[in-house]
Amino acid sequence: MALTTTVPDICAPRSHAAKRVSILEAATNVFCREGYAGANIDMIAAEAGVSRQTVYNHHVDKEQLFVAVVLALTERANSGFFETLATFPDHPENIEEDLVAFAIRLNRNCICSGDGKFLRKLIQTEGERYPELFAGWREHGPGKTWTALAARFGRLAHAGHLDMDDPDVAARQFLALINADLHVSMMLGDQPDDERVRQAATNAVRTFLRAYGKRDSR
């Protein structure tokens, strides 16, 4: 096992809030790189450029810091999703083209974002260790996004642009489809380029519209 050392605060003076952000960012990197079991406070302090005691001044122990990381990532991921959702095509001129453009934005801003990748990795590696924490994440992360997206699809259906009985199911399927072509490669550490993101969005929307497009447009 590599030796770790406690370091003094080596950066220029920072506010309490700035140090808290630095610690959370460092902890995110260390937990994703080392896993929960392999991470320790000294590693996180060194990466944040603060002392070990400074980390403890903000978080009482490693477990509490891990919980804070998951909550912060969930909050940021949700913020990115809802900013992107504000661009949803409520009044589409061309339903396929407009949904493809929206799906590209979702892929870039959410699924392929750093926060999205970190969350997926932590869930995959540490979900069994903290079932209650990740149950809360499902409720306040995907649960909220599915509901919000379902409402938008419901409006499109009501306006006659789509044909669906259950917008909740449609929203989950839409998100699964736009993620499908990228998921495995991102799990292996690849970062999809713009062309792959565009193609994944196009494939997803065409499949989605075969199920939910108006019959005269299928």
State where each predicted segment sits.
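Residues in soluble alpha-helical coiled-coils and helical-bundle/repeat scaffolds
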Residues: 60-64, 68, 90, 111-114, ...
